[in-house]
Design a protein with these regions (language model features):
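Short amphipathic alpha-helical interaction segments
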Residues: 1-12
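A short, conserved structural fragment
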Residues: 11-21
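Short gly/ser-rich loop at a beta-strand->alpha-helix junction or flexible surface loop bordering the NTP-binding
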Residues: 22, 38-117
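Minor-groove-contacting beta-hairpin "wing" of winged helix-turn-helix DNA-binding domains
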Residues: 22-29
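Residues in well-ordered beta-strands of folded domains
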Residues: 25, 80-82, 122-124
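Short, charged/polar, Gly/Pro-enriched secondary-structure boundary elements
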Residues: 30-38
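Hydrophobic alpha-helical interaction segments
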Residues: 99-189
Length: 189
């Protein structure tokens, strides 16, 4: 128990990082755990969901999160909100009231482009057992972001395929990736 407690402390301080199930490595200067500072709008949406549906699981991915990795910077933000399937209609109704004209429910790529709006919220179904954020459960982990990028048809339309090598190289060379988390989520997708 003492060893487990010490290991948790080292992980929390960032001296050691988790790279898989029961697998850890000493954090070097070159690689770190992924963190993103969420926009005020993302925090507002998260707060509204926590207040209205305290037990619901959800994640928020901001399109501008990719700016760290892409060659051509994204000037406009879109929130991709994934929520549990059972409650998606209720969440849609809530957000539609609070953000009129800015919410799309599981749009096709054609609908996305037709109704695109800066600051738009795209609502879709959360894959069961999706990785939860480390600081906040609703934060999107890098592992989820990478898997969604190659498996979500809407994201494939939004992000140019020519950006994929830079995104993958930047993510894999700059951040510690929990491989078991990545592959487990990829199997679920």
């Amino acid at each position: 128990e003492a060893m487990r407690k010490r290991l948790r402390g080292l992980v929390k301080s960032g001296e050691v990082v988790r790279v898989g199930r029961n697998a850890y490595c000493v954090s070097g200067n070159k690689m770190s755990s992924y963190r993103h500072e969420y926009s005020e709008e993302a925090n507002t949406v998260a707060q509204a969901l926590r207040e209205a549906f305290p037990a619901v699981e959800f994640t928020i991915f901001e399109l501008v999160q990719l700016n760290e990795f892409v060659n051509h910077q994204l000037a406009h933000n879109v929130l991709f909100l994934s929520v549990e399937d059972d409650i998606i209609d209720f969440v849609f109704d809530l957000l539609k009231e609070q953000f009129p004209g800015k919410v799309l429910l599981d749009p096709t790529p054609e609908l996305y482009h037709q109704y695109w709006y800066d600051g738009m919220i795209v609502l879709n179904k959360l894959v069961t057992e999706a990785p939860r954020g480390i600081e906040e459960a609703w934060h999107t982990r890098l592992e989820k972001l990478l898997v969604d990028l190659v498996s979500d048809s809407l994201l494939q339309e939004v992000i140019s395929k020519s950006e994929y090598p830079a995104i993958l190289e930047g993510a894999l060379s700059g951040y510690v990736i929990d491989e078991s988390c990545l592959f487990r989520y990829a199997k679920r997708r």
